[in-house]
Amino acid sequence: SYDNSHPFIVETDLGNIKVYGTEFNVRRYTDEQIVRTTLVNGSVGFQSKESVTENYVKIEPGYQISYERGEDVVVKKVKVANEIAWHKQLFCFERCTLEEIMKDVARWYDVKVTFDNENLKGLSFTCTLDRYDEIEKLLRFFEEVYNIEFKIEGKHITIMEQ
């Protein structure tokens, strides 16, 4: 909506996002206790369900509001293109751990991912990958960058050192 005089509210279980005329992205998954709103252009505000005031935290384009239950609202500058890459059917990760990446991969491909070695979770990647590639092709990228291997058994993927 580009009508600033008639904002609308996007409600989540963690808080409300007031939209004042804008292009924005909301990321909220039931298996995570965090909601994120990224502003592309226009204006949005956020108010947690736990807030004792009527005030909304407002952000400018290029910023993201993150809120985790019981914590403070966090505002940070982000690369908007990374946050809305899914519009272009891409995964876009910048300095993300393999654990963070595999959460998104598991959700998208509807698979369960386990790590054979806890140290592998912290491996860091910056990459852009096609969401519609076969999962084997996507995982091959990670195998080529680090000395890791993916064992696929049906809907279960185990990540291990080579």
Regions picked out by a protein language model, each given a short descriptive name:
Residues 1-162:
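A residue-level detector for the "anchor" residue at the start of short, highly conserved motifs
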